[in-house]
Amino acid sequence: MTGRREDKRTLLVSFSGIDGAGKSTQIEALSSRLAGDGLRVRLIRFWDDVARLKGIRETSGHRIFKGDQGIGSPSAPINRRDKNVQSGPMTCIRFFLYFVDAVSVRRVVRKALRSDADVVIFDRYTWDELANLNMRNPIVRAYIRMLASFVPRPHVSYLLDADPLQARSRKPEYPLDFLYANREAYLTLAGQIPGFTVIAPIPIHEAAQQVLERAREELSERKVSRPESLIGASKDDSNRYTEANIRV
């Protein structure tokens, strides 16, 4: 706890949503406004700083399922095959990978809360992995409840809702039917896990204002507490993979 004021409480925030929902834009806007307020903001990228066993994910998406690599754009659409591949064996693999990531989340959150940051922003969180699962399966629902109770819960979990058709036009990587199903999964999670703030599909500047107001509301109340019972983990993996390769 060296270097931290005893009365200091770090605000933990996460951003989630389907691909193309505008998370990067809103994260940048919130970070800039909070920094302008004189707050120390730290950004943690889930795929870079939290996710583990990234080589397995890259292999399954590209070599096994023959999906494209990289990040899609309107001028260069791609066809990814990773988190949109639904099967019994893949669900079992995801159960394992997501639990490993959950352990990593606990370690990363504990480290972040010991830093001098006033606000810690997660670019994606455990919720983005759980939204890849088939929630119609009772075993899957039990697993989701278990993992949701295992990871530290952000004080504010933003869900940027988006029209799948518009999202895919901005970031063409996955089939439209998957994006519709993925959106419904996110909304279902938001209704079951406390702490979500759903931002409806509205113009960027209006969404940014809603995001900022919610963060400032939480900061002004300061009714926050550090997640307890965090466990340790091994040192960070020095190998860095890009988000484009590991979204299993």
Regions found by a protein language model. Give the residues of each.
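Conserved lysine of the Walker
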Residues: 23
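NTP-dependent small-molecule kinase module
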Residues: 3, 169-248
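Hydrophobic positions on the alpha1 helix immediately C-terminal to the Walker A/P-loop
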Residues: 26
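ATP-dependent small-molecule kinase phosphotransfer cores
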Residues: 48-135, 142
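Hydrophobic anchor at the beta1->P-loop junction of P-loop NTPases
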Residues: 15
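A glycine- and Lys/Arg-enriched "phosphate-lid" helix/loop adjacent to the NTP-binding pocket
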Residues: 119, 124-188
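Extreme N-terminal, non-catalytic leader segments
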Residues: 1-12
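P-loop (Walker A) phosphate-binding loop of NTP-binding proteins
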Residues: 18
